Swiss-Prot record:
Mg(2+) binds at T85, D87, E100, Q119. It comes from the Bacteria. NCBIfam families: PRK02234.1-2 (NF002581), PRK02234.1-5 (NF002584), PRK02234.1-6 (NF002585), recU (TIGR00648). This is Holliday junction resolvase RecU. It is found in: Cytoplasm. One of its GO terms (molecular function) is nucleic acid binding. The keyword Transferase does not apply. The record marks K102 as: Transition state stabilizer. Gene3D superfamilies: 3.40.1350.10. GO terms for cellular component: cytoplasm. Endonuclease that resolves Holliday junction intermediates in genetic recombination. Cleaves mobile four-strand junctions by introducing symmetrical nicks in paired strands. Promotes annealing of linear ssDNA with homologous dsDNA. Required for DNA repair, homologous recombination and chromosome segregation. Its cofactor is Mg(2+). Its EC number is 3.1.21.10.
Length: 200
């Protein structure tokens, strides 16, 4: 189809100056996020009948939705219905497991401000009912993963509330936690640590 200007001249798209996109350097796809790595790990455990662990959905109240096409709805505004508890829960060897996944770019410590009071209270309740609660912490700069039992997280949280430091040092995590081995399948083998810490 030929397009013409009002004066009769033909529109030639090639004569228009081309806009060159500005290149921005991003490293966001360099590595997977902790959540993606755990989802992949949990899928491996489920597929191989090792454990049944899933990411908890975040309950949202949808307020505004746009329908640009009949088959496509876009959520424009939503609110959390209630504070979420922890990220993952499931069953392993007949025991309920519940854990939170956290990442930090810090080299020497993990800030406790990454936790919320309702998450700490939830972990306390899981432990009180003989469930297994823990946190998986990733130090992204070192690509290191640690499993830290809820009792230690609760102790460090209480220390903070009584005037102590507002973070957990990496040395404390190394002392009280367990370094997780990483591989191809499963990506983060936290079940192996559960076997030694909780089932031996």
């Amino acid at each position: 189809m030929t397009i013409r200007y009002p004066n009769g001249k033909r529109y030639n798209q090639a004569s228009q100056p081309q806009k060159t996109p500005i290149k921005t350097h991003t490293y966001s796809n360099r590595g997977m996020s902790l959540e993606e790595e755990l989802n992949e790990t949990n899928q491996y455990y489920l597929t191989h009948n090792i454990a049944c662990v899933h990411k908890k959905p975040t309950p949202l109240q949808i307020v505004k939705v746009d329908y640009p096409a009949r088959s496509a709805a876009v959520v424009k505004e939503a609110y959390f219905k209630q504070p979420s508890t922890t990220d993952y829960n499931g069953v392993y060897k007949g025991k309920y497991i519940d854990f939170e996944a956290k990442e930090t770019k810090n080299k020497t410590s993990f800030p406790l401000q990454n936790f919320h009071l309702h998450q700490i209270e939830h972990m306390k309740q899981v432990v009180a009912h003989n469930g297994i609660a823990f946190v998986i912490i990733k130090f992204t700069l070192f690509d290191e993963f640690y499993l830290l039992d809820a009792k230690h997280i609760i102790a460090f949280w209480n220390r903070q509330n009584t005037g102590g430091r507002k973070s957990i040092t990496k040395e404390e995590i190394e002392e009280h936690g367990s370094l997780l081995s990483c591989g191809y399948h499963p990506r983060i083998d936290y079940i192996r640590v559960l076997d030694t810490v909780y089932f031996s």
